[in-house]
Regions:
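PLP-dependent amino-acid enzyme catalytic core
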Residues: 1-143
Length: 143
């Protein structure tokens, strides 16, 4: 659910804050997040998404789901390494100030679809509120 809402939250927030740059989502995945993020951002105006995954670290079905995702703004990169290496690479891109300057000059800026993005976490709060309310209504103890 959160990854279907995130693209629209980002685009709306960018518009309200007069952000003119196109948002480039960088995400590392070990499987399911990649497909969900690609599907959520597919053909969303003002965005591009690049998903990095370990070639030998996802199931064949997960890989096929990612590499066959439709969308003119979706890109998938299989790396030789594990998830931690993919995640480290993404973090390095985020912290590279020279790369950020080059991206800005070209009209782009980075963001993420991983859980470091508060826009991904906030919609998930609904799950916890619902579960609590249901337990309370059923008079079950909350752990």
């Amino acid at each position: 659910m959160a990854l279907s809402i995130l693209p629209h939250l980002l685009v709306t927030s960018a518009r309200k804050n007069n952000v003119k740059n196109e948002i480039v989502i960088l995400t590392a995945t070990s499987g399911d997040t990649g497909k969900a993020a690609l599907a959520g951002f597919a053909d969303v105006p003002g965005t591009k998404i690049i998903v990095f995954y370990p070639k030998s670290g996802v199931s064949p079905i997960q890989e096929k789901q990612m590499v066959t995702q439709k969308g003119d703004n979706t890109f998938v990169v299989g790396i030789h390494g594990n998830f931690d290496q993919a995640q480290t690479g993404v973090k390095k891109m985020f912290s590279d100030t020279e790369l950020a300057k080059e991206m800005d000059a070209a009209g782009y800026q980075f963001s993420s679809a991983n859980s470091i993005n508060i826009g991904r976490l906030v919609p998930q709060i609904a799950y916890y509120v619902y579960a609590y309310a249901k337990l309370y209504a059923d008079r079950k103890s909350v752990v």
